[in-house]
C-alpha cells in the first residue's frame, strides 16, 4: 500500500547550502520532518550546482518520512548567471543591463526544458526571451 501524503512544501534554496535556519526549518518543522536529514540529502544532491538557486518540491508522508524532487533553476537565475549580473534592471523598459545572443537563449532553454510547459525548443526559447526582456536584457538576432 502506498504511503499517505500529508503535505507538499515548495522551497527555493541555494544549491549545497540548505541549513535548518529559516526558511527550511519552520517549513519542514510544522510537518514533523527530520530537518537535518533533509538538509544533508539536499546538499549532497546539489553540491555540483553551487551558486544556483534550486527549486525543490518536498512531499511529506503520514509516517513523517519525505521525498523531494529537484527542479531546474529559475530562468531569471540562469540568465543572470549567463551574463554575470547581480540583478535585473529596475526599469526594464528604459534601462538595459545586457544582451543575450540566440545561442545563449537556446542554451538556457535546453537547460530549462524539463520544467517548461513547452512542446519544442523554439517555444521554450520564446519563454526565456520573455523573461529576459522583463529583466531589462535585450535579445540579439
Curated annotation (Swiss-Prot):
InterPro entries named in the record: Ribosomal_uL11, Ribosomal_uL11_bac-typ, Ribosomal_uL11_C, Ribosomal_uL11_C_sf, Ribosomal_uL11_CS, Ribosomal_uL11_N, Ribosomal_uL11_N_sf
Mod. after translation: One or more lysine residues are methylated.
Keywords: Methylation, Ribonucleoprotein, Ribosomal protein, RNA-binding, rRNA-binding
Domain of life: Bacteria
Keyword Ribosomal protein: yes
A Pfam family hit: Ribosomal_L11_N
UniProt keyword tRNA processing present: no
Any one GO MF annotation of this record: large ribosomal subunit rRNA binding
GO CC annotations on file: cytosolic large ribosomal subunit
Record-level GO BP terms: translation
Family in the record: Belongs to the universal ribosomal protein uL11 family.
Record function comment: Forms part of the ribosomal stalk which helps the ribosome interact with GTP-bound translation factors.
Assembly and interaction partners: Part of the ribosomal stalk of the 50S ribosomal subunit. Interacts with L10 and the large rRNA to form the base of the stalk. L10 forms an elongated spine to which L12 dimers bind in a sequential fashion forming a multimeric L10(L12)X complex.
Name under which the protein is recorded: Large ribosomal subunit protein uL11
Organism for this UniProt entry: Clostridium botulinum (strain Eklund 17B / Type B)
Gene responsible for this protein: rplK
